[in-house]
Design a protein with these regions (language model features):
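A glycine-centered beta-loop-beta connector
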Residues: 40, 62-65, 70-86, 127, ...
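Cytosolic regulatory modules rich in charged/polar residues
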Residues: 14, 116-119, 143-148
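Bateman (tandem CBS) regulatory domains
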Residues: 33-46, 100-111
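Short alpha-helices
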Residues: 1-15
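Internal, active-site/partner-interface "lid" segment
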Residues: 11-42
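Alpha-helical scaffold segments in soluble metabolic enzymes
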Residues: 4-8, 22, 39, 57, ...
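The conserved cystathionine-beta-synthase
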Residues: 49-66, 91, 113-133, 137-140
Length: 148
């Protein structure tokens, strides 16, 4: 009964989820609606490798990075990403040839990216819509970062 009264009062006063988030910024709704990707991105110790990275080095970099992926960069240019799933699928398909492949051979080109100033809820929606678990955060000052 109390919930029904609260909802009715909120509707009568035009009280929105954004209003609630502003009054309760520490809650999960407030965090998602008010925080930006820049507030939660990982910008250090990213698992970045060159396009010619070997299969063995890819596995090591994915394990060490702790994110389930590596970022393939040629200088400051993002060439793609390789996930632990990409590595598993390549092992199944290529079997004996697997250890001859390079990162560029199995990389997903044009990974999903987002700007650091976007709201966290936008990043969550984008990840859900694209069925991915990570987004690269790009901007002119720092071309590669990851929301954590």
């Amino acid at each position: 009964m109390g919930d029904a009264l609260a909802v009715s009062l909120m509707q009568m006063r035009g009280f929105t989820s954004v209003d609630f988030a502003r009054l309760h910024p520490g809650g999960s709704l407030g965090r998602r609606l008010l925080m930006t990707v820049g507030n939660v991105m990982r910008s250090h110790d990213l698992p970045v490798v060159a396009p010619d990275c070997s299969a063995t080095d890819m596995i090591h970099a994915i394990s060490k990075g702790g994110l389930g992926l590596i970022i393939i960069c040629d200088g400051d240019r993002i060439e793609g990403i390789v996930t632990d799933g990409d590595v598993r699928r390549a092992m199944e398909r290529r079997r004996a040839e697997f250890f001859n492949i390079k990162a560029a051979d199995i990389a997903t080109p044009n990974p999903k990216t987002i700007s650091a100033d976007r709201k966290l809820i936008e990043a969550e929606k984008m990840m859900t819509r694209n069925k991915v678990t990570s987004l690269l955060v790009t901007d002119a000052a720092a071309p590669v970062k990851l929301p954590t």
